[in-house]
Structure formats: structure tokens, C-alpha cells
Amino acid sequence: MTRIKAACLIGWPAAHSRSPMIHHYWLRTLGIEGGYAIESVPPEGFGEFVLHLSTHGYLGANVTIPHKERALLLTEPDARARAVGAANTLWYDGETLRSTNTDIEGFLNNLDACAPGWDGIDEALVLGAGGSSRAVVFGLIERGIKRIHLANRTLDRAQAVADQFNADVVPTAWQDLAAVLPRAKLLVNTTSLGMKGQPALEVDIGLLPTDAAVADLVYVPLETPLLAAARARGLATADGLGMLLHQAVRGFELWFGTRPSVTPELRALIEADLAPA
């Protein structure tokens, strides 16, 4: 009997994820016989689970908190995963388990869809210095952005991220945002500020250029106060749900051999599921 092709999400916890809904939508609409499951694996069991991933019946996996850094050490990472210091997508290349970080692709492709031509800019401002920030900074460097201001309330953390990259990444103190905003043609929030249950992100959108674009990685709520303020000014915006959908594309392609599309129907499906949140 032929085993159905399947992938999974490995996390701790992982039950809240919308990834199964996304991948099952693509499997159904593309007519592919396959599956996508959630595997709640504690940190102490992660190594053994990943090393025997195929034995568990999987041809690949997504990895979420708290396992992304550990996944890097247990696989053969590509340049993107190494640069970001974390892997979120695993797949088999023959007998070799490889890994990448699709947050970069998700961020870039979402911006391309929401603000075409955005990458013709010289300067960008990124808020936050966590793992998502590293993915965003790497993506901006890939697109040739000449100067990236990286702001964080703890300046040492911004400096640590800047030190990872041989590029013009400028650590910026939070209190100096007002001086940088007028030059930034792209503002990206990678912090949890503005997320449901978190304090609002207090940034004066009015200081941005009139042709700037604003991206927020938060997707609960879908329209954060930051994005609402940007839209009120007529700026191009990109929300966190778009990035979530676009980052899932590459994994599906690696596992099932077909590149899916992020459609309005898929977005509406996930939006409806997010609505109670």
C-alpha cells in the first residue's frame, strides 16, 4: 500500500497554528492526496523526533517556537537559515534532511503583492531585534536596500543583530525614531506591540514620507493601530497575515512538488478563522 505523503508542524505548543488549514486548502484545491498534521513535541524530545522524521511518516516539516534554533543544528541549513540563525522548514533531499527559513520569502513576497516597487528605496526602518527582525533585515539586504535602521528599546540587542550582517545596518535608539522616520520609505514592525493583549506601538506615522510603505508582522488583530494610521494617511500597507500565507508556499512546494498560490479565497478562509480572536 502506498503511504500518503504528509508533512507536519512541530512546536511546543502548536495547537493554535493555522498552518494545517492553509496546507489542507492547497491540497484540496490542487487535487493532491496528502496530509498535514500538528506534532506537539517538548524541547527534550525534539532532537529524536527530527532525526527520525521519516520514520514518523513525514517527508518534511515546519518548525515553530521554541525549536527554530535547534532545528538549524540538526539539519543541513541553507544560506538563509544560517544567516537568520533559525530554520522553520525542513525537507528531505535524498537521505539528507535540509532546512531553510521561509519567513524571508514570506516577508518579501507579501510586500511585493501589497506595495509593488517598494524595493526601489534607499532607507528602511525596522522595529525590533528578535528572530523575525533578523529575517526581515536579511530580506532587505537581499533586495539591495542600502541603509537599514534597526531600532530596539535595548540598543545592545539591535547592535547584536547588526553585527551579524556585513551591510549598512544601523542600530538606532528608540528615542531617536523621530529623526529617522522622515527618511524611511519603509517601516516594518517586528515587535509584538499592537498585538491583541499587548500595548500599542507608539510611532508617529505622520513623520514618514508620503510615499512610504508600512508592514506589520502582527496578524491578531489583522489591522493593527499602526496599519490603521498608515492607511488613514494613504500609505501602502502589508499585514502579518499576508506574510504568514506567503511563507507557507515554499514548504508546500518542497514537500508536494507543486507551487501553490496565495488566493483571495485562502485569505478569506483564514480571516474567518481569526475573526473570533
UniProtKB/Swiss-Prot annotation:
It is an enzyme of class 1 (oxidoreductase). The lineage of its organism: Bacteria, Pseudomonadati, Pseudomonadota, Alphaproteobacteria, Hyphomicrobiales. One of its GO terms (molecular function) is shikimate 3-dehydrogenase (NADP+) activity. Belongs to the shikimate dehydrogenase family. One of its GO terms (cellular component) is cytosol. NADP(+) binds at G128, A129, G130, G131, S132, N152, R153, T154, L155, D156, R157, L217, G240. Keywords: Amino-acid biosynthesis, Aromatic amino acid biosynthesis, NADP, Oxidoreductase. This is Shikimate dehydrogenase (NADP(+)). Its EC number is 1.1.1.25. The gene is aroE. GO terms for biological process: amino acid biosynthetic process; aromatic amino acid family biosynthetic process; chorismate biosynthetic process; shikimate metabolic process. Shikimate binds at S17, R18, S19, T64, N88, D103, Y219. Involved in the biosynthesis of the chorismate, which leads to the biosynthesis of aromatic amino acids. Catalyzes the reversible NADPH linked reduction of 3-dehydroshikimate (DHSA) to yield shikimate (SA). The active site is at K68 (proton acceptor). It comes from Rhodopseudomonas palustris (strain BisB18).
